Amino acid sequence: MLESHLIIHFLLAVIQFLLGTFTNGIIVVVNGIDLIKHRKMAPLDLLLSCLAVSRIFLQLFIFYVNVIVIFFIEFIMCSENCAILLFINELELWLATWLGVFYCAKVASVPHPLFIWLKMKISKLVPWMILGSLLYVSMTCVFHSKYAGFMVPYFLRNFFSQNATIQKEDTPAIQIFSFVAEFLVPLLIFLVAVLLLIFSLGRHTRQMRNTVAGSRVPGRGAPISALLSILSFVILYFSHCMIKVFLSSLKFHVRSFILPFFILVIGIYPSGHSLILILGNXKLKQNAKKFLLHSKCCQ
């Protein structure tokens, strides 16, 4: 018999999985229908679709880990499985980073020649960002494949220390490279982009308040809404990365009480941020409402 807290954890994991699959599925389906209708896809829609697909697979993996932890199933640590897990995790992280860069380039105002060039070219750069991410992540996986003991993604190596046999001990050089390549580089790019965006939106909000003080202007709350959306993105992204780093620095047995909690927290990001994206995008929000109404009518 499962203990009560494990039953609650399993129910939360199922809800999280269904929510993440639904929200990311809505993004993929809506943009896919637009692609079929118009035979082209906007750069932002392309980036969101790729991000949503990677998050669906990431959500599947997180649910799989939840099942392992709850039911104490032995984790099969073969190089093929670990390479896939590493690829999905790193690709999602990079695509989310480029989404932050895209928002920054489109919305922020920075009087610098490089930023002005990026602002003009960002739409054309989106496909290259996606291809570059695929290439970078593939190279990371190739590097890991040369070290049998390092095939597990950095944030998962210590999860199943009692279940897995690590053939080699991590050297400091490998640990540093893994941390920099898998976390630090995309995290720094993301933080620079969103900080520029937050400062720009904050400055714009203050200017609007000073200009239209005491009057009601349509769309006045749009910058504040965008700022809150970006802040929630930052909090989810940063907490997701920090928890992975924290778990990488400690060893947990699968029966540890704190491990299921951290896995649930990690799963909030790919589902929670996609929900925020839908609520902040008029096209996605309308189609999500239509889908829910259609589902109710069919019952």
Swiss-Prot record:
Its membrane topology, per UniProt? Multi-pass membrane protein
Q: Can you tell me where the transmembrane regions are?
A: 10-30, 56-76, 82-102, 125-145, 179-199, 223-243, 258-278
Mention any Pfam family matching this sequence: TAS2R
Which parts of the sequence lie on the Extracellular side of the lipid bilayer?
Answer: 1-9, 77-81, 146-178, 244-257
Single GO MF descriptor: G protein-coupled receptor activity
Question: Belongs to which family?
Answer: Belongs to the G-protein coupled receptor T2R family.
Q: What else is known?
A: Most taste cells may be activated by a limited number of bitter compounds; individual taste cells can discriminate among bitter stimuli.
Q: What is this protein called?
A: Taste receptor type 2 member 1
